[in-house]
């Protein structure tokens, strides 16, 4: 469903980090991969600091490797840039690729290093064998 009903509510709840609302909507059948009116999926607009929201979305089938059509950023790029190691680890465990570049040729590790997130950069280097 494009931008309506519980699917639109799911993106909003995910963006606000509302764990219980996300859980209720998913259990009621909301599509974890539905796009909102801006063309973004809940996993792309979720509050990156909420690893619980990420876990719920992924548990219900959210695609961890969905790319923004304009920037080619994926949720791992956002988590790395913003400094959310727990969320990044949840995404990686669910199959998110760490070796894909955004539209500017940057990997998640590049974004972590640019922002001074050393713990995330270490994790990404270790996870990719780099």
Swiss-Prot record:
A Gene Ontology term for the protein's cellular component: cytoplasm
A GO MF annotation of the entry reads:
protein kinase binding
**GO biological processes:** cellular response to cell-matrix adhesion; cellular response to nutrient; cellular response to transforming growth factor beta stimulus; cellular senescence; liver development; megakaryocyte differentiation; negative regulation of cell cycle G1/S phase transition; negative regulation of cell population proliferation
Which family is it part of?
Answer: Belongs to the CDKN2 cyclin-dependent kinase inhibitor family.
For this protein, the parts annotated as crossing the membrane are none
Residues annotated with Phosphothreonine modification: 12
Subunit relationships = Heterodimer of CDKN2B with CDK4 or CDK6.
Q: In which tissues is it expressed?
A: Expression abundant in lung, less abundant in testis, barely detectable in liver, and not detectable in neonatal kidney, adult kidney, brain, heart, or spleen.
Q: Where does the record place its ANK repeats?
A: 5-34, 38-66, 71-100, 104-130
Keyword Hydrolase found: no
* Keywords of the record: ANK repeat, Cell cycle, Phosphoprotein, Repeat, Tumor suppressor
Name of the protein: Cyclin-dependent kinase 4 inhibitor B
């Amino acid at each position: 469903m494009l931008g309506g009903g519980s699917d639109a509510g799911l993106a909003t709840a995910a963006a606000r980090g509302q764990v219980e609302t996300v859980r209720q909507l998913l259990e009621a059948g909301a599509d974890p991969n539905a796009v909102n009116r801006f063309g973004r999926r809940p996993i792309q607009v979720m509050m990156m600091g909420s690893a619980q929201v990420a876990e719920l979305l992924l548990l219900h089938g959210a695609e961890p490797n969905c790319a923004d059509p304009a920037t080619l950023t994926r949720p791992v790029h956002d988590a790395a840039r913003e400094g959310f190691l727990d969320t990044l680890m949840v995404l990686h465990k669910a199959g998110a690729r760490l070796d894909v570049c955004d539209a500017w040729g940057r990997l998640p590790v590049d974004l972590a290093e640019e922002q001074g997130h050393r713990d995330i950069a270490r994790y990404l280097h270790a996870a990719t064998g780099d």
